[in-house]
């Protein structure tokens, strides 16, 4: 019974009409990892695929957006698997390399951070570069808008209720940094996804304002 198990880490993925890239990701991620997917009202039979692969998932009846979906699946994991040590957020579009996971978790095991932000070496969007510049200036930490992070579940449980949905990524990282928890970076190089729209960070000045 999964409910009674204690997982060292759980990977959560928010997906919206990304069945094919999700299929590729799930095929490559080691079966030793527990995965929970939230489907954000997809119309590409994502839930049918997940059910066929016996992947644990929850689904939205309508599209709520990336941040709301991520908050929802995080709260689901906190409630259902309270003894989990780390929660990993991982994007569904194929930008992140599954081969990085082993090195990331090895680093976490040795350094034991409360939050690990996997900073992208190849950020290409101007809006994200601006937010990154100001965040680094204030906290000496890079890339708060990265979708690949590792959270200490105890810390995440403490701050998740305080977070404004609209500014989820920056607000949560800022709160953890401000309270002198151990926050580290781990550099990664992402795949460049053509015609990929930014999930977050479109509103430059509102993100900067909350810093």
Regions found by a protein language model. Give the residues of each.
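Cell-envelope/extracellular polymer assembly enzymes that use nucleotide-activated donors
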Residues: 8-10, 171
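A conserved acidic beta->alpha catalytic loop
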Residues: 39-47, 94
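Conserved catalytic loops of nucleotide-sugar-dependent glycosyltransferases that act on lipid-linked
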Residues: 70, 122-211
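Conserved donor-nucleotide/metal-binding helix-loop-beta segment in metal-dependent transferases, i.e.
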Residues: 100-117
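Short beta-strand-to-loop acidic/aromatic patch adjacent to the donor-nucleotide binding site
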Residues: 83-95
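Short hydrophobic beta-strand elements that form part
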Residues: 10-14, 59
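Conserved donor nucleotide-binding strand/loop of the catalytic core
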Residues: 48-80
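Short, well-formed alpha-helical segments that are part of the catalytic scaffolds
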Residues: 13, 17-31
């Amino acid at each position: 019974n999964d409910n009674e198990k204690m997982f060292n880490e759980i990977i959560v993925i928010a997906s919206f009409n990304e069945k094919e890239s999700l299929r590729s990701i799930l095929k490559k991620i080691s079966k030793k990892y527990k995965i929970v997917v939230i489907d954000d009202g997809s119309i590409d039979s994502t839930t049918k695929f997940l059910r066929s692969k016996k992947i644990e998932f929850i689904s939205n009846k309508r599209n709520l957006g990336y941040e709301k979906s991520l908050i929802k699946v995080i709260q689901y994991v906190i409630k259902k698997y309270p003894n989990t040590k780390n929660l990993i957020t991982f994007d569904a579009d194929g930008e992140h390399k599954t081969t990085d996971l082993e090195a990331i978790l090895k680093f976490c095991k040795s350094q034991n951070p409360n939050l690990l932000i996997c900073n992208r070496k190849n950020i290409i969007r101007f809006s994200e570069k601006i937010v990154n510049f100001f965040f680094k200036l204030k906290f000496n930490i890079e890339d708060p808008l990265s979708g690949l992070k590792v959270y200490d579940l105890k810390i995440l449980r403490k701050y998740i209720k305080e977070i404004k949905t609209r500014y989820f990524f920056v607000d949560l990282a800022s709160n953890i940094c401000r309270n002198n928890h151990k926050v580290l970076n781990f550099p990664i190089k992402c795949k460049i996804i053509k015609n990929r729209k930014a999930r977050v960070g479109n509103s430059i000045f509102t993100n900067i304002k909350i810093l």
